């Protein structure tokens, strides 16, 4: 009889972190239905709503990102980080994960750092072609680093890199709509050229606004 697999997945703050994390969790569940998965995110961020809605348990840390424009505000950020590291230790004691997976974002920093101190195997998943600060800091002691693009040796130890591509949700992979059906679904004119604009993370709004403004001129 297999020992129950305890998997801790940490990260979040934006959809760019949350949805790959959700895809990883779903993939683990497909292969190991008995797996016990716990998410750790940042308090008051979107993961605290999205992941329970998908049927997963999540714990929030009071962690936040550093303010690079207003340095004095970082006093509170450091205090939150220290508190988060203390809470991370308790989470590890209570949950006893077999592996800790970090997908980037505020919460994965203290969570994976504490896991590494305890000798728990850690895996990092980097979605972008330019690595985030948190993942770069965790890379040296990570057991494996899954990336979406070639050439990530400039950020991470080459011997730890696995080029896996980005995790994709199964409902997207299962989509069978034809281009014509997709245009109809979104109310687009099938006789006009269709342009898809995809922005990443919180910068998507700026990209969308620029494109919309350009189309109006």
Model-flagged regions — what are they?
Residues 4-12, 30-80, 85:
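Conserved nucleotide-sugar phosphate-binding/catalytic loop shared by glycosyltransferases and other
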Residues 12, 42-44, 63, 127, ...:
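Cofactor-binding loop segments of dinucleotide-utilizing enzymes, especially the Rossmann-like FAD-
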Residues 87-101, 107-123, 136-144:
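Glycosyltransferases and closely related glycan-assembly transferases
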């Amino acid at each position: 009889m297999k020992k129950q697999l305890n998997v801790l997945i940490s990260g979040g703050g934006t959809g760019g972190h949350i949805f790959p994390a959700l895809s990883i969790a779903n993939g683990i569940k497909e292969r190991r239905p008995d797996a016990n998965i716990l998410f750790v995110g940042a308090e008051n961020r979107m993961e605290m709503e999205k992941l329970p809605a998908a049927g997963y348990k999540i714990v929030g840390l009071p962690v936040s990102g550093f303010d690079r424009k207003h340095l004095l505000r970082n006093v509170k950020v450091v205090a939150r980080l220290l508190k988060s590291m203390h809470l991370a230790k308790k989470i590890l004691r209570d949950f006893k994960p077999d592996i800790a997976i970090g997908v980037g974002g505020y919460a994965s920093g203290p969570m994976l750092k504490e896991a590494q101190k305890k000798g728990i195997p850690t895996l990092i998943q980097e979605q972008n072609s330019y690595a985030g600060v948190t993942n770069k800091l965790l890379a040296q002691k990570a057991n494996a680093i899954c990336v979406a693009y070639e050439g990530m040796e400039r950020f991470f130890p080459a011997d730890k890199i696995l080029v896996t591509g980005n995790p994709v949700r199964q409902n997207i992979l299962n989509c069978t709509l034809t281009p014509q059906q997709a245009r109809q679904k979104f109310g687009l004119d099938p006789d006009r050229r269709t342009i898809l604009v995809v922005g990443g993370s919180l910068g998507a709004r700026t990209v969308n606004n620029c494109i919309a403004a350009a189309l109006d001129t």
